[in-house]
Amino acid sequence: MKNIRNFSIIAHIDHGKSTLSDRFIQVCNGLSEREMKEQVLDSMDIERERGITIKAQSVTLDYTARDGQTYQLNFIDTPGHVDFSYEVSRSLAACEGALLVVDAAQGVEAQTVANCYTAIEQNLEVIPILNKIDLPSAEPDRVAQEIEEIIGIDATGATTCSAKTGIGVEDVLETIVAKVPAPEGDVNAKLQALIIDSWFDNYLGVVSLVRVKNGTIKKGEKFKVMSTGVAYQVDRLGVFTPKMKDLDHLKAGEVGFIVAGIKDIHGAPVGDTLTHAHNPTDKPVPGFKKVQPQVYAGMFTISSDDYPDFREALEKLSLNDASLFFEPEVSQALGFGFRCGFLGMLHMEIIQERLEREYNLDLITSAPTVVYKAIKKDGEIIEVDNPSKLPEPGAIAEIQEPIVRANILVPKDYVGSVITICIEKRGVQVDLNYVGNQVSITYDLPMIEVVSDFFDTLKSVTKGYGSLDYELIRYEPANMVRLDVLINGDKVDALASIVHKDQAKYKGRELVERLKELIPRQMFEVAIQAAIGGTIVARSTVKALRKNVLAKCYGGDVSRKKKLLEKQKEGKKRMKNIGSVEIPQEAFLSVLKK
């Protein structure tokens, strides 16, 4: 046990943690040269394309240190994006140490700071590493100072390396061996194993990645899941080197996988504790918190025949993703679908992209919304995650919206423009500190403003240097209203949204104008309106197409022409009463995408 080291890497997107993990695998000969490829641990195509890590992965490597001893390094890769911080907190619960990898050219980013505090809260040994020192623009001394000022850990003797060229990677491994504490735990105690992650394999069923805290688990033994109390038998267990390598047992301090033929997707919930069926422990492993979805959106298949496949795809994805929530929903405009809950916009985009890619589904997503609380006049509180659930304006005493505390780190040249966008988004300034070249700005902002497009706007006004981290802190009363879209007097439920009253007119006008361009002309006039309750705030009309009914009259009497025009007018009127407007899918997509 004293030669085991469990650690994870905390780093911002693009600061080189996946490349560094590739180097670890190479130095320790985890894979042959032929099997090495870039970003070995980012196994999904979408992770490679976007260059981000979404799922936490784990690798067990044997490293022979300079003192001649062989150490077992269990390394858990973690994502760096703000939406996936729950993956990070889970990975950290399984470790004793964390490498804080910072790009020596760019410096500290807000996301890294947030994850670093999570690690410090869980009493992990945080070791600063300065990466990308091969870059001409690298300034290791300045960045070391920044780490000290912003995060507050001593970085004077920080190990420097370049994961790309391989310089200093062995020094990093030596630092891990020297500074990360060995795991505590008793091999002979009752079994306690934390499920860090679980995913569905078509052949094996549910595969769970576990960290054994106490005791030993052997092949063929029966164990039970503490939250459900259901018992299973171990079919296979072992470690990832990154390939699956079978072993006979896993003991306290180790990280590995367990396959027990669990078919039910929720059979082994992530963050749960496993223990022996015949001799169970009383208490589960602490340090795990349930994640609440922050953003909700309706997802619908374009053809209704795909609905059963869609349900199955969501069930499979939700196994790999503890934070994805979904329930069936019916929309008059879009048919059958699901109301899904996500951690943030990136999470939503990725889920949608995975559904479309891995399961060949064509999907439409309704406008994302956050959870509001509507307090009715009779005192009842309704949680509203869908505009259609909002009661009529007359029945509501007040609506409360979720407020997040956003920590933004930007280079000092961009402070003015960042403050401007925060004010536009109805933000309230809490704090502003200058730290070296960076400025740390803290704002309380309505969550709906942050999840819609705040991140993109922040990136564009700061030329990509700004970074953001946010957490929900409270609910507060706000003047929110439901904006409905009516087409020829009929409400289109998929286009309804909850907006702030001050912005309602502007948003309504914008929506109506956009729809006007997208809805094709019909044989009759189409009225597009935006309404709040019974008040119409914006209107636009798609003019009717008309056939030239006078083409066959050569000369002749004017009353003949009048008669034909009157007849056409009557026909259009009748058509308008009974005709229904086909809204093309592109119109929905374009309006919902903004």
Swiss-Prot record:
Alphabetized CDD domains for the sequence: EF4_II (cd03699), EF4_III (cd16260), LepA (cd01890), lepA_C (cd03709)
Q: What membrane topology is given?
A: Peripheral membrane protein
Write down the EC number: 3.6.5.n1
Please give the catalytic activity noted in the UniProt record: GTP + H2O = GDP + phosphate + H(+)
- Statement: the UniProt record of this protein carries the keyword Secreted: no
Q: Which InterPro entries match?
A: EF-4, EFG_III/V, EFG_V-like, EFTu-like_2, G_TR_CS, LepA_C_sf, LepA_CTD, LepA_IV
Keyword Lipid metabolism listed:
no
Location(s), subcellular: Cell inner membrane
Q: Which residues bind GTP?
A: D14, H15, G16, K17, S18, T19, N131, K132, I133, D134
Q: Domain named tr-type G: which ranges?
A: 2-184
Task: Supply the SUPFAM superfamilies for this chain.
Answer: EF-G C-terminal domain-like, P-loop containing nucleoside triphosphate hydrolases
Q: Which GO terms describe its biological process?
A: positive regulation of translation
Q: What keywords is this UniProt entry annotated with?
A: Cell inner membrane, Cell membrane, GTP-binding, Hydrolase, Membrane, Nucleotide-binding, Protein biosynthesis
Query: Which PROSITE patterns does the UniProt record give?
Result: G_TR_1 (PS00301), G_TR_2 (PS51722)
* Pfam families according to UniProt: EFG_C, GTP_EFTU, GTP_EFTU_D2, LepA_C
Q: What terms describe the molecular function in GO for this protein?
A: GTP binding; GTPase activity; guanosine tetraphosphate binding; ribosome binding; translation elongation factor activity
Gene Ontology cellular component?
Answer: plasma membrane
Q: Which HAMAP family match?
A: LepA (MF_00071)
* Function statement: Required for accurate and efficient protein synthesis under certain stress conditions. May act as a fidelity factor of the translation reaction, by catalyzing a one-codon backward translocation of tRNAs on improperly translocated ribosomes. Back-translocation proceeds from a post-translocation (POST) complex to a pre-translocation (PRE) complex, thus giving elongation factor G a second chance to translocate the tRNAs correctly. Binds to ribosomes in a GTP-dependent manner.
The record's comment on protein family reads:
Belongs to the TRAFAC class translation factor GTPase superfamily. Classic translation factor GTPase family. LepA subfamily.
Check the record and name the PANTHER family matching this protein: TRANSLATION FACTOR GUF1 HOMOLOG, CHLOROPLASTIC, TRANSLATION FACTOR GUF1-RELATED
Protein name, entry field: Elongation factor 4
Protein source organism = Francisella tularensis subsp. novicida (strain U112)
